[in-house]
Curated annotation (Swiss-Prot):
Family: Belongs to the peptidase C15 family.
Gene source species: Lacticaseibacillus casei (strain BL23)
Quaternary structure, from the entry: Homotetramer.
Subcellular location: Cytoplasm
Protein name listed in UniProt: Pyrrolidone-carboxylate peptidase
InterPro entries in alphabetical order: Peptidase_C15 (IPR000816), Peptidase_C15-like (IPR016125), Peptidase_C15-like_sf (IPR036440), PGP-I_bact-type (IPR029762), PGPEP1_Cys_AS (IPR033694), PGPEP1_Glu_AS (IPR033693)
Family matches, as Gene3D superfamilies: Peptidase C15, pyroglutamyl peptidase I-like
One GO cellular component term: cytosol
Chief place of localization: cytoplasm
Gene Ontology biological-process entries: proteolysis
Name of the gene: pcp
Length: 215
């Protein structure tokens, strides 16, 4: 089994992005699965081209995209991607879409193929906070989540894909009072546990348990 794990570069006012920093620190093999790591730009459309090329080259069984969600307390596997770009800030290319449909021939939304409940449970059992999330936002995180699902729908039907958000790092909240943070070590531990759950549930679907939050 091969799993492509992507992480965004820094964006906005931050000089570091926990997503790519955690991805870079993942082992090359987890639970027997080969881990392919990829840094992607925080840019609408360009990020999708980079991931598309990597999927075509690596032919992974799974794609797990990682992104930063400042303000969240826990790692949050995402349930659904929506067909909408609505940037609260410009991306790293200076582009800020407003109420923009990502693909006119795409579904209004795509649900992940990842076992998100099993992932959240495994992360917590590893000692790291986690919960299923029902919104990936409308910035570049949702964009790449949707784009990979669209690719699966139109080009790569054999892959399974999804997205997971992680909180700020402690150094990112020094000037952000009362904002939650999680250490890089915990990020890596949590992502590793999530990937182990993906491998363990391959071909079995997700577990039946109560998960999720209002957001």
């Amino acid at each position: 089994m091969k799993i492509l794990v992507t992480g965004f570069d820094p964006f906005g006012d931050d000089k570091i992005n926990p997503a790519i920093e955690a991805v870079k620190r993942l082992p090359d093999e987890i639970a027997g699965a080969q881990i392919v790591k990829l840094e992607i730009p925080t840019k609408f459309n360009v990020s999708a081209d980079v991931v598309k090329d990597a999927i075509a080259k690596e032919k992974p069984d799974y794609v797990l995209s990682m992104g930063q969600a400042g303000g969240r307390f826990e790692l949050t596997p995402e349930r659904v991607a929506i067909n909408l770009d609505d940037g609260r800030i410009q991306d790293n290319a200076g582009y800020q879409p407003l109420n923009h449909t990502i693909h006119g021939d795409g579904e209004n939304a795509y649900f992940t193929q990842l076992p998100i409940k099993a992932m959240a449970k495994a992360i917590r059992e590893a000692g790291v906070p986690a919960a299923v999330s029902n919104t990936a936002g409308t910035y570049v995180c949702n964009h790449i989540f949707y784009q990979v699902q669209y690719m699966r729908d139109k080009m790569f039907p054999d892959i399974k894909a999804g997205f997971m958000h992680i909180p700020f790092l402690p150094e990112q909240v020094v000037t952000r009072p009362e904002t939650p943070a999680l250490s890089l070590d915990d990020d890596v531990l949590g992502i590793t546990a999530a990937i182990k759950a993906i491998v363990a549930r391959d071909g079995k679907g997700d577990i039946e348990t109560i998960e999720g939050k209002n957001h």
